[in-house]
Structure formats: C-alpha cells, structure tokens
Amino acid sequence: MHTSALVLFSGGQDSTTCLAQALSKYERVETVAFDYGQRHKVELDARLNVLREIKSRFPHWAPKLGEDHLLDLAVLGQVSDTSLTRDVAFKMENSGLPNTFVPGRNLLFLTLAAALAYRRDLQVLVTGVCETDFSGYPDCRDDTIKAMQLALSLGMDKRFLIETPLMWIDKADTWRLAHALGGQALVDLIIEHTHTCYLGDRTHRQAWGYGCGACPACELRARGYERYAAALSKP
C-alpha cells in the first residue's frame, strides 16, 4: 500500500488540485517544481503562497505536507525555442502543435521527479497532465505517462506509480474536484493564489483568478470556470 507521494507542483490550478488530492490520500506528501526559464516565472512565487495558505486553511493537511523542492532546469530553456521560454507571440506551428509546447518538458520533469523520489523514498509521482482539456501536447497523453512509468521503474529498479488525477476530466470538472476535496475554501484559495497565465500577469483580477485573460492558459481556465459556475447556478 502506498503511503507517500511527490507532487509535481507548479503553483497553478491543476497542480494545486492534484496536491489537495494527494494530501487527502497519503500520509506524507512532498512537492517539486522546476525553474526552466519560463516567461511566467511568477508561478514559482505563487506556489510558495499556495503552500502557505494550504497549511493555514487546512490544518488537517498541514502535518502531511513535507519538504518542498525547487530544481534548476535552465538547460531546457536553452534547447527550447518556444513562446513559454521566449518573448514571442502565441501561435500554431506547422506541426499542428501550439508554440507553447516545450519539447521534452514533462519527460524531463518526470525523470527528475523520479530521481528525487528515489532518494526521498517516495512511492508515487503525481502530475496534473490531462488529455481532455489540453493543447495537443504529446507528453500529456496517457500513453506517454504509462510509458514513462514503465521506463522509470525499470531504469531505477523501483516500482513507481505515476498518478494523473486530471487525465480524463476537463477544466470545469477540475474546479468541481477541487470543491469536492476542500470545499469553497479550496476553490477560493485556487482563485486568489494559484497562477496560470503564460504572460505572468498578476495585475488583472478575473472571476477565476489573476491573469491577462487572453493567453491560451487563461482562456482555458476561464472557460472551465464559466461552465463550473453556470452549473452551480442551476436550480
């Protein structure tokens, strides 16, 4: 039986929801983030605020929340010419993928997370990737995650489990899951303290949180919140 987990925690809506689920399931939960030269580096500050607020607002989770880790992955920005690591406009590429796709990002994240989990004796890796509401990123697909789980388990001779709580749900359902896990208190925390905007905008407050409201990440989060809120208003 698994008792511990390492959550890949960026400080966004999805990873915060995954962290809440891990805290509801496991006795010991640690977190890890990556500094890869992302334009929205403000998320690295936001995640610390989220961790602080979780400890404050959810005292039953606080004792389970262990060490937080930040890994330097600047080399990823050196090999990736994308709109997440360069000051260029968001657009679709000829490949059919948006230029927000950072090749190899989630593969590297999972590899480094597994190496850290190996050293920390953590049994489960938790990541917020999904196939339902995503931009076609191949490293978010269920087949990719299953292949990574097998490769990491074989390569480190340790049976890892990679959990993807959001794999088959959309953004509206992610809001619903957050409410189911932590009630309105968790929804409010996500609105006020998590960060999604690719441009790093923390000056514009929307109904769903802070962001420019126009980048792909903001649009996806906004649509999900609108559907979630609309369902709540129905008798």
Swiss-Prot record:
Pathway listed: Purine metabolism; 7-cyano-7-deazaguanine biosynthesis
- Which top EC class is named for this enzyme in its record? ligase
Q: Which domain of life is it from?
A: Bacteria
User: Which parts of the sequence bind ATP?
Assistant: 9-19
Copy out the cofactor comment: Binds 1 zinc ion per subunit.
Q: Which UniProt keywords apply?
A: ATP-binding, Ligase, Metal-binding, Nucleotide-binding, Queuosine biosynthesis, Zinc
Describe the reaction catalysed, as an equation.
7-carboxy-7-deazaguanine + NH4(+) + ATP = 7-cyano-7-deazaguanine + ADP + phosphate + H2O + H(+)
As recorded in UniProt, its EC number(s) are 6.3.4.20
Q: Which cofactor does it need?
A: Zn(2+)
- Biological processes per GO annotation: queuosine biosynthetic process
What residue range is the signal peptide? Answer: none
Q: Which GO terms describe its molecular function?
A: ATP binding; ligase activity, forming carbon-nitrogen bonds; zinc ion binding
Q: Which Gene3D superfamilies match?
A: HUPs
Which amino acids does the record list as binding Zn(2+)?
Answer: 197, 212, 215, 218
Query: Which Pfam family is one of those matched by this entry?
Result: QueC
What does this protein do, in the record's words?
A: Catalyzes the ATP-dependent conversion of 7-carboxy-7-deazaguanine (CDG) to 7-cyano-7-deazaguanine (preQ(0)).
Q: Which family does it belong to?
A: Belongs to the QueC family.
Q: What is this protein called?
A: 7-cyano-7-deazaguanine synthase
